[in-house]
Amino acid sequence: WNLELLEMMACGKHVIATNYSAHTEFCNADNANLIEIEAKEVAYDGIWFHGQTGKWAAMKENQLDQLISHMRSIHKLKQDNLLKLNYSAIQTSHQFSWKNTAEMVIKYV
């Protein structure tokens, strides 16, 4: 779900995320710097995921280039004193406030 990403958005930070998986429920081109995923690979990290089930986004050279580009763009804005709050991200995060979440739960319970 990537709650940490949503928390950063609530703080108005400029976030970088893949355009893949659960966080696409709240991340889009208006509120995040997205990395386009072209392929998936077997989920294996040698600790928790051992390749038996599931796939995750493959980070190949093109995705690393996108990540570097997004990082450079954000850093350049900061260096030039042009980095502002990400108001689109803040607005998005309000949809997932505790108040709104509680109201949705009450509505369906």
Feature-to-residue mapping (PLM):
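Methionine-biased hydrophobic packing positions in alpha-helices, especially
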Residues: M8-M9, M71
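Short hydrophobic faces within alpha-helices
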Residues: E7-M8, I16
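Short glycine/serine-rich donor-binding loops of glycosyltransferases
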Residues: N2-L5, Y20
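A charged, aromatic-enriched C-terminal amphipathic alpha-helix characteristic of glycosyltransferases
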Residues: A58-S69, K76-K107
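Classical protein tyrosine phosphatase
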Residues: A17-S21, E25
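Short amphipathic alpha-helical segments and helix-helix/interface helices
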Residues: L5-L6, T24, S93, I106
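Short hydrophobic beta-strand element within catalytic cores of glycosyltransferases
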Residues: H14-A17, N33-L34
